[in-house]
Amino acid sequence: MVRKIGLALCILFLVGCGKYTMEEAKENGDIIVQNGVENSDRFESFLKKSKQGKSDQIRITAYTIEGDPILYDVKYNGKTYQYSSDASRDQFRSTEDDRKNEVCQQLDKTIVKQEAIYTLRQCAEGTDHELLRLPK
Protein backbone atom coordinates (compact mmCIF):
# COMPACT_ATOMS: atom_id res chain seq x y z
CA MET A 1 0.00 0.00 0.00
CA VAL A 2 2.81 2.39 0.91
CA ARG A 3 4.50 1.64 -2.43
CA LYS A 4 1.32 2.49 -4.34
CA ILE A 5 0.97 5.81 -2.53
CA GLY A 6 4.66 6.55 -3.13
CA LEU A 7 4.30 5.73 -6.81
CA ALA A 8 1.19 7.91 -7.12
CA LEU A 9 2.96 10.85 -5.45
CA CYS A 10 5.98 10.41 -7.71
CA ILE A 11 3.79 10.45 -10.82
CA LEU A 12 1.94 13.57 -9.64
CA PHE A 13 5.26 15.27 -8.93
CA LEU A 14 6.62 14.46 -12.38
CA VAL A 15 3.45 15.64 -14.12
CA GLY A 16 3.56 18.88 -12.15
CA CYS A 17 7.21 19.48 -13.06
CA GLY A 18 6.45 19.19 -16.77
CA LYS A 19 4.19 22.26 -16.76
CA TYR A 20 5.64 25.61 -17.85
CA THR A 21 3.33 28.12 -16.18
CA MET A 22 2.46 31.56 -17.44
CA GLU A 23 4.12 33.01 -14.34
CA GLU A 24 7.38 31.24 -15.23
CA ALA A 25 7.11 32.45 -18.82
CA LYS A 26 6.62 36.05 -17.64
CA GLU A 27 9.56 35.80 -15.23
CA ASN A 28 11.74 34.49 -18.08
CA GLY A 29 10.79 37.37 -20.39
CA ASP A 30 8.88 35.21 -22.88
CA ILE A 31 6.52 36.68 -25.42
CA ILE A 32 3.21 35.14 -24.34
CA VAL A 33 0.36 34.32 -26.70
CA GLN A 34 -3.00 33.61 -25.10
CA ASN A 35 -6.04 35.75 -25.91
CA GLY A 36 -3.68 38.39 -27.28
CA VAL A 37 0.05 38.98 -26.97
CA GLU A 38 1.92 39.96 -23.82
CA ASN A 39 5.45 41.38 -23.80
CA SER A 40 5.30 42.38 -27.48
CA ASP A 41 7.90 45.07 -26.76
CA ARG A 42 10.44 42.24 -26.38
CA PHE A 43 9.56 41.11 -29.90
CA GLU A 44 9.97 44.68 -31.19
CA SER A 45 13.43 44.78 -29.56
CA PHE A 46 14.33 41.48 -31.27
CA LEU A 47 13.21 42.89 -34.63
CA LYS A 48 15.27 46.04 -34.15
CA LYS A 49 18.42 44.10 -33.21
CA SER A 50 18.07 41.68 -36.10
CA LYS A 51 17.65 44.57 -38.57
CA GLN A 52 20.90 45.98 -37.18
CA GLY A 53 22.61 42.62 -37.68
CA LYS A 54 23.00 42.05 -33.93
CA SER A 55 22.60 38.63 -32.34
CA ASP A 56 19.56 38.08 -30.14
CA GLN A 57 17.11 35.37 -29.13
CA ILE A 58 13.50 35.15 -27.99
CA ARG A 59 11.05 32.58 -26.75
CA ILE A 60 7.41 32.75 -27.76
CA THR A 61 5.17 30.72 -25.48
CA ALA A 62 1.69 30.04 -26.84
CA TYR A 63 -0.91 28.53 -24.53
CA THR A 64 -3.60 26.19 -25.84
CA ILE A 65 -7.25 26.40 -24.79
CA GLU A 66 -6.45 23.77 -22.15
CA GLY A 67 -3.57 25.91 -20.85
CA ASP A 68 -0.75 23.76 -22.21
CA PRO A 69 2.36 25.64 -23.39
CA ILE A 70 3.92 25.28 -26.82
CA LEU A 71 7.39 26.83 -27.00
CA TYR A 72 8.96 28.54 -29.99
CA ASP A 73 12.61 29.58 -29.71
CA VAL A 74 14.14 31.89 -32.29
CA LYS A 75 17.82 32.83 -32.32
CA TYR A 76 19.40 35.32 -34.70
CA ASN A 77 23.17 35.06 -35.18
CA GLY A 78 23.62 38.16 -37.33
CA LYS A 79 22.92 36.32 -40.60
CA THR A 80 20.32 33.59 -40.19
CA TYR A 81 17.54 32.60 -37.82
CA GLN A 82 17.47 29.31 -35.91
CA TYR A 83 13.95 28.10 -35.19
CA SER A 84 12.93 25.44 -32.69
CA SER A 85 9.44 24.42 -31.60
CA ASP A 86 8.49 22.16 -28.72
CA ALA A 87 4.93 20.87 -28.21
CA SER A 88 5.92 18.16 -25.73
CA ARG A 89 3.92 19.78 -22.90
CA ASP A 90 0.69 19.87 -24.94
CA GLN A 91 -1.58 16.97 -24.01
CA PHE A 92 -2.94 16.86 -27.58
CA ARG A 93 0.46 17.42 -29.19
CA SER A 94 1.60 16.52 -32.62
CA THR A 95 5.37 16.26 -32.29
CA GLU A 96 5.72 15.69 -36.03
CA ASP A 97 5.74 19.49 -36.31
CA ASP A 98 8.48 19.95 -33.68
CA ARG A 99 11.67 21.48 -35.04
CA LYS A 100 15.17 21.60 -33.61
CA ASN A 101 17.44 24.41 -34.76
CA GLU A 102 16.01 24.70 -38.25
CA VAL A 103 17.80 27.46 -40.16
CA CYS A 104 15.69 30.15 -41.84
CA GLN A 105 17.03 32.96 -44.01
CA GLN A 106 14.61 35.80 -43.34
CA LEU A 107 11.90 37.19 -41.09
CA ASP A 108 9.12 38.87 -43.06
CA LYS A 109 6.37 41.22 -41.99
CA THR A 110 3.07 41.11 -43.89
CA ILE A 111 0.15 43.44 -43.24
CA VAL A 112 -3.29 41.83 -43.52
CA LYS A 113 -6.26 43.97 -42.51
CA GLN A 114 -5.33 45.33 -39.09
CA GLU A 115 -2.59 42.82 -38.27
CA ALA A 116 1.15 42.62 -38.79
CA ILE A 117 2.05 38.97 -39.38
CA TYR A 118 5.67 37.95 -38.77
CA THR A 119 6.85 34.82 -40.57
CA LEU A 120 10.19 33.03 -40.88
CA ARG A 121 10.81 32.21 -44.54
CA GLN A 122 13.27 30.26 -46.67
CA CYS A 123 13.65 27.61 -44.00
CA ALA A 124 15.82 24.53 -44.48
CA GLU A 125 12.96 22.05 -44.24
CA GLY A 126 10.92 23.95 -46.83
CA THR A 127 8.14 25.21 -44.54
CA ASP A 128 7.57 28.82 -43.49
CA HIS A 129 6.84 29.41 -39.80
CA GLU A 130 4.42 32.08 -38.65
CA LEU A 131 5.71 33.46 -35.36
CA LEU A 132 3.35 36.18 -34.27
CA ARG A 133 0.39 38.38 -35.18
CA LEU A 134 0.34 41.87 -33.73
CA PRO A 135 -2.25 44.63 -34.10
CA LYS A 136 -1.12 47.17 -36.68
Predicted feature locations:
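Sec-dependent N-terminal signal peptides of Gram-positive bacterial secreted proteins and lipoproteins
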Residues: 1-21
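Extracytoplasmic electrostatic interaction patches
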Residues: 65-136
